[in-house]
Amino acid sequence: MRFLNNKHREKGLKAEEEACGFLKTLGFEMIERNFFSQFGEIDIIALKKGVLHFIEVKSGENFDPIYAITPSKLKKMIKTIRCYLSQKDPNSDFCIDALIVKNGKFELLENITF
């Protein structure tokens, strides 16, 4: 796992905090933040209409943050989601989403694996 410098980590945490506020306005209930497994981390786990949403938050100013979600990152997320579900509720319906924060604006991309 890569270690982030404090400034980068603080920026990421701030983006995640803002993302939670945005998601709440869309009717999401925050379940958990920064869930870790041996495979990686899920930034936000939220519930909406009975579906768990595993949300990767990416922020950036001088580039399109969606490109930071690589196929390798998705594989790690899926393994981490399996760990979460095995511990909490293996029968939950779920989807994987990305929340892009760029220049103070939010864009929620749902079901990014399809």
UniProtKB/Swiss-Prot annotation:
Top-level taxonomic group: Bacteria
Show the disulfide pairing: none
User: Which is an annotated Pfam family here?
Assistant: UPF0102
GO molecular-function terms, A-Z? nucleic acid binding
**Protein family:** Belongs to the UPF0102 family.
Under the heading NCBIfam families, the entry gives:
PRK12497.2-4
| Name this polypeptide is given | UPF0102 protein jhp_0762
Species? Helicobacter pylori (strain J99 / ATCC 700824) (Campylobacter pylori J99)
